[in-house]
From Swiss-Prot:
The keyword Repeat does not apply. This is Flagellar assembly factor FliW. The keyword Chaperone applies. Pfam families: FliW. One of its GO terms (cellular component) is cytoplasm. It comes from the Bacteria. Residues 152-173 are annotated as: Disordered.
């Protein structure tokens, strides 16, 4: 039973209790989900690099997200003044940057970060905003190689998945 300062929802990863101070409001929604405004972040596993950005408006909607800096040290985004005002940013340290992660069914080797649609969250004001990036030098996706056998992640320094038999040019991180 949920307490007065929390809500309880059934999600694709099970029943979750969400305290009201963990709700993040997205005034514009997200790309493709403009009508969904209230979300929370759910941890899948302790220490895992991935989270679920869970909609509270639609409990069936949860997006896999990750901190891009866990995989890329040189990822840069541009945030204009209107977006900074909407996020109520007073200091850059108030913002967390996340990117959506796609894992095609049955093809974990094609796990990719979406670098062109970062999600910014002002953790103090609990406001979120997706800020599309238009930098042509930025690859739209950044492919990861997930190795369940030893729990490691290998980063592919290329913008497309490997072809069959192709040397992956992997760098361990």
């Amino acid at each position: 039973m949920a307490r007065q300062n929390e809500i309880e929802i059934q999600t694709r990863i099970g029943r979750q209790r969400i305290t009201l101070d963990k709700i993040i409001h997205f005034p514009r929604g997200l790309a493709g989900f403009e009508g969904r405004h209230d979300f929370t972040l759910l941890q899948l596993r302790e220490g895992a690099p991935f989270l679920v950005l869970q909609s509270l408006d639609d409990p069936g909607l949860g997006l896999l997200v990750a901190d891009p800096y866990s995989f890329l040290t040189d990822y840069q985004i541009r945030v204009g003044d209107p977006e900074q005002r909407l996020l109520k940013l007073e200091n850059i340290r108030q913002v967390a940057v996340l990117v959506t992660v796609s894992i095609p069914a049955g093809q974990p080797e094609k796990t990719a970060l979406n670098l062109t649609g970062p999600i910014l969250i002002n953790h103090r004001a609990r406001i979120g905003l997706q800020v599309p990036q238009t930098d042509a030098s930025l690859p739209p996706q950044f492919y990861l190689h997930m190795d369940d056998a030893n729990g490691s992640t290998t980063v592919r320094r290329k913008a497309s998945p490997p072809a069959a038999g192709e040397d992956k040019g992997d760098v361990q991180e």
